[in-house]
Amino acid sequence: MTTNKNYLKKTLQLVLPLLLGLFLCWYAFAQFSTEELALIKEQFLRADYSYLWLSVGMGFLSHVSRGLRWQYTLASMHYFPKRYNLVLAVFVGYLLNLTIPRSGEVSRALLINRYDKVPFDKSFGTILTERAIDMCILLLLIAIVFVFQFDLVWHFLESYFTFSYIIVILLVLGLLFVAFLYWLYRSTTSIAQKIRQLLSGIKEGIFSIVHLKKKWQFVAHTLFIWIMYFLMFYVVFFSMEQTKDLSLIQVLTAFFIGSFAIVFTNGGLGAYPLFIAKVLLLFGVAETIGTALGWVIWIAQFLMIILFGGLSFLLLPILNKGNR
């Protein structure tokens, strides 16, 4: 019975975001007439794809840097996995995120545990630290966008999100989390003890950043990762005549809005181009052009993950034949 429940849960985790993505693809294109769809296709085909490949290259560099940055938090706990394993695990993680959202973080820790014998809980803790740092940087970018484009962004978010529902959901989740912590603290069951042991290792991984020996290298990699993230998005705007003259803050606004789309579906399928088109419409870019550009950006990121993630998936067992 438990096996069936787990199978159903995993199936829903995989299928529901995919179905939502396919629905958003249909929704995005259903609003256009035949002539507008032909225009989207024309703009898509006329784009300068040299910028797409430049974007792919920048995405590759950002993920390599993420893998290399990971070594510093692990080293602070006296674990020294092979650098190529760290980089390849990052690419495999992004590949798996296309199937089940957020599964990539777990897979990274599992791969390093398998090939370099780094305890899962500790390596997973370092990944959580990375994500916390990423969230801080994203919040900084959001603050910059709100300073320059507050009315526009607020109007956009109000149009697509019901904040009262979001607040209720967050409150319910918060109460459930508090109840879980209370149970975890008071329970003497074996499963609670195992969870506490796991969380203890995760906690050590999270606080590994406090003991970094190469802090400036870590900071440099972090800045490089985010500069590449933005540039891999920005350069694609030069692939079309109608978008190449948008200002830096306008592109940053689209970058911020686009980051929301990744949450809803596998890799932003359907949602990402839709969000990009809607926000660019506020800057006077025709929705047909914005839709075409959104798909070019999404395809650049998708190609990068499929290409290098698939290659990494094949290389990891080959390069670690004696480490299984």
Regions found by a protein language model. Give the residues of each.
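Juxtamembrane transmembrane-helix termini in multi-pass membrane transport proteins
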Residues: 74, 113-114, 123-124
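Predominantly cytoplasmic-facing regulatory/coupling regions of multi-pass membrane proteins
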Residues: 1-90, 148, 152-259, 285, ...
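Membrane-interface alpha-helices at helix entry/exit sites of multi-pass transporters
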Residues: 83-88, 103-106, 118-132, 286-296
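Transmembrane alpha-helix interface/packing and boundary motifs in multi-pass membrane proteins
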Residues: 92-101, 253-273
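Membrane-embedded alpha-helical segments of transport systems
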Residues: 95-100, 124-147, 296-308
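Hydrophobic, aromatic-rich membrane-embedded alpha-helical segments
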Residues: 87-114
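Re-entrant/interfacial helical elements at transmembrane boundaries that shape
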Residues: 106-114, 266-282
